[in-house]
């Protein structure tokens, strides 16, 4: 609206097409790119796990540690602060140092370790000790998206990212229900 389009006209997608406006159309686009299926699965499963966490945490915290809504809210606020720190300050540095592939592995490993700590924590302080480790899980998402964009042509990158957003939304709908 205020800033001009930065993408050169030669690299822009063709005009709007109703064929691409189907609700599952963007997800069907992923079928044409088998080289990214593994990375797409990582995006879906990581987001699936992410969406289960806030929807069940209050119940888990009460059953495991006797934390009520107030304490659970404080913990979720800390999770949010740690997420901001990782996203704003650490991801770029870590990816520069490790590269995307290793950053994905580190991020996913930290997520697994964090969830293992959460599940085996016998006390609240043990659970809280897992928060900084689990926060590093956020490294995986942008690195995965970067690798996906490297695997497809520039003419479909926006549509592929849209398809990923659709899958993330689908995970957000399905995961809490399970």
Language-model segments: residues:
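Pair of pore-lining "gating" transmembrane helices in MFS-fold secondary transporters
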Residues: 32-53, 132
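Short amphipathic helix-loop junctions that connect adjacent transmembrane helices
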Residues: 55-72
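Small-residue hotspots at the loop-to-helix junctions and early N-terminal turns
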Residues: 69-77, 162
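Helix-to-loop junctions at the C-terminal end of transmembrane segments
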Residues: 86-100
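A late C-terminal transmembrane helix in Major Facilitator Superfamily
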Residues: 155-178
């Amino acid at each position: 609206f205020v800033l001009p389009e930065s993408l050169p006209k030669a690299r822009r997608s063709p005009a709007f097409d109703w064929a691409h406006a189907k609700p599952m159309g963007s997800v069907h686009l992923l079928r044409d790119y088998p080289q990214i299926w593994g990375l797409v699965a990582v995006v879906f499963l990581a987001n699936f796990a992410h969406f289960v966490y806030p929807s069940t945490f209050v119940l888990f915290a009460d059953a495991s540690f006797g934390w009520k809504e107030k304490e659970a809210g404080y913990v979720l606020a800390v999770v949010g602060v740690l997420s901001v720190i990782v996203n704003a300050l650490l991801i770029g540095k870590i990816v520069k140092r490790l590269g995307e592939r290793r950053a994905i592995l580190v991020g996913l490993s930290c997520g697994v370790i964090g969830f293992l700590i959460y599940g085996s924590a016998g006390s609240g302080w043990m659970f809280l000790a897992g928060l900084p480790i689990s926060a590093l899980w956020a490294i995986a998402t942008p690195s995965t998206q970067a690798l996906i964009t490297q695997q497809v042509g520039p003419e479909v990158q926006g549509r592929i990212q849209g398809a990923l957003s659709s899958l993330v939304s689908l995970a957000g709908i399905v995961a809490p229900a399970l």
